[in-house]
Amino acid sequence: MRKFFLLIIMALVMAVAPSQAAIYMVGSGPFGNWDPAHGIEMTDEGNGIYTLTINIGETVWFVFADKLTSDWNDFNANHRYGPDGNSSQDVHLFEIVKTQKANNNHAYKFQGANEEYTFTFNLNDLTFKVETFVEPLGPDPFDFTAGDINADGEVSISDVSLLIDILLGGSANYDVRQRADVNGDKEVTIADISQLIDLLLGGSVPEPVKEGYDYVWDDKALPEVHLDVSLDEWNRLLTLYDANSFTAQYVMGSISFVKNGEVTVIDSVGIRLKGNTSRRRPEGWYGEMHHRDNTDWHHAHFGVNLRKFVDDDAHTIQGVRKLHLKWFKDDPAYVREVFCYELFRRAGVWTAIRDNYCRLWIHVGGDTNEAYYGVYGLLEPIDKRYLKDRKERFGSNNGYLWKCRNGAAGLNNPNGDIWYDDDTDDRHAYTLETQTEEFDSARVQLVNFMNKISSLNDNDFYTWIQQVTDVDLLLKTYAVNVAVGMWDDYWNNANNYYLYFNSKDQNNYRFFFIPYDYDNTLGTSLRCGNQDDAGRQNPLHWGNDGNKLIARILKFDDFRAIYVKHLQFLVTQGNAMMDRQAAQARIRSWQAKIADYIDNETGEDTAIEDKPASWGNHSEYNLLKSNSDNFFNVKAASINAISP
């Protein structure tokens, strides 16, 4: 009945929809689907040079990107990549060079920052209409016209057909499913067909209202965060750092959160320093207090607790109580952590936190002006509110949440450093973050969990692990972790993750592995643990098997097959995950969004550069080129070389 209803809708739309001119999709780069049936041929000239020859005796609309031009002579001026062709945020990616060829052919050489293509057009047989040129690595995946599900530049009956196919169970990659959510309600249903029909008939899609967590972590926006701290409180923050660089103590200040012109001001909030090896003094050097003139500002991580000093409903931003403000330490590309968390969510790992970019200012009382700290990461804290927001998926938000770190959280030592968050500056391998008054019970549960990982025989472990966790979700999480090259993790370095047990029962619970801290990824590599190359390390032997959880799971053929399947899905072209072209399109979009705001008053990290951290052991890795040192190419080869 449902299928019949959808077919009736499609027939009605075809009856009323205007006819559309033919559009030939020529492809999305040297690996696109070129169409010989329409006289299109491509030759690989080597060294990254490709010649595209077109011989078509008809008018053709050329779909190469998202900008319109009717004259090749003004192509340089019109070809831009970004949210708005007239925006200063746009980035020129190509230099267009036109050269005369024999037989009235013209070669158009598109020289990008990282790639070079040569397209040859036979002008005797080809008539250009209004063209759209798509950057060879694909259009901006975050900027599309509502209803244009197939991304051909228009809303047409073909989009209705594709939407119906998806509703009937047809396959579609992540980006297509995002576009299929025409009404913006975060699911693809028959209501999207109704909205799509309205669009075809000249209607419009109302802008969805962002509320709560979606308001704060809205990836379409670039919010401003302004912190205001009195002189005494700022100097106290510096003194706390000098006494203990790992201080967890808060000072009092106020925050202004500005998004799309809407300002939220909250007084009496808590502000503290955060980070592990990245902890820094935000101004000056040891013993120095604030200098009003020639201030020596430094990038640092900050935590903001809106309810630290006043616990009421007014001390939230649409229900959000805490913010993590993270500078892009050792990430010249300004993209690694943003990419990783978005990839987790894109792959269906719902335990991944929300994150976005923001711009940060700090004002110290008495100063004439506030200091611009530049572009920061705006991260969702993993705490009680994180659990409550995902209560339905976890099954309960009243269990035990553990923060696991310090390179000593291998789940292999029941006598290890296990404690609870007692509001001191002490740091532990395992810190209980919730239900701290029940620490003794929580500790027994964690120790029993460790013992079962280590001591159960294989048959019992196989049965038990499926009872206490979603094995598919865990292996998908770890597949993303390995694919992005996260060497500073649980398996390799006993570090950087959270565990959540959704029940206080000692035996009847489900545990969830929560990924955390992904700045040392995407080619930032280090000789550590079991590996010295985060791009080429065998994904089946990623870490130290003394950290037994993942190693024991992968001993079983069926679990190992699931893990390999998830890895290969991530790097397969067409899935819109982390094959090179899909990854580069997203990275360029993010960088275009923030490019004009990088320069800042700390004088640090003032340019976007395509390179890993300077202290890494593989400085050759890049993200935006197409050569043999491209991290996405290297990682895909390493994954495709394995089998279950």
Regions found by a protein language model. Give the residues of each.
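Acidic glycine-/aspartate-rich tracts in secreted/extracellular proteins
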Residues: 29-32, 67-73, 168-172, 201-202, ...
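Phosphate-handling architecture centered on phosphoinositide signaling
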Residues: 139, 207-477, 619, 623-643
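Cellulosome-associated attachment modules in secreted, modular CAZymes
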Residues: 138-208
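Intrinsically disordered, low-complexity polar regions and short flexible loop motifs
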Residues: 35-37, 52, 77-136
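Aromatic-rich carbohydrate-binding modules that target alpha-glucans
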Residues: 21-59, 67-91
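Bacterial N-terminal signal peptides
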Residues: 7-15
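Middle-to-C-terminal accessory/interaction subdomains
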Residues: 214, 220-222, 233, 293, ...
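Positively charged n-region of N-terminal signal peptides that target proteins for export
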Residues: 1-4
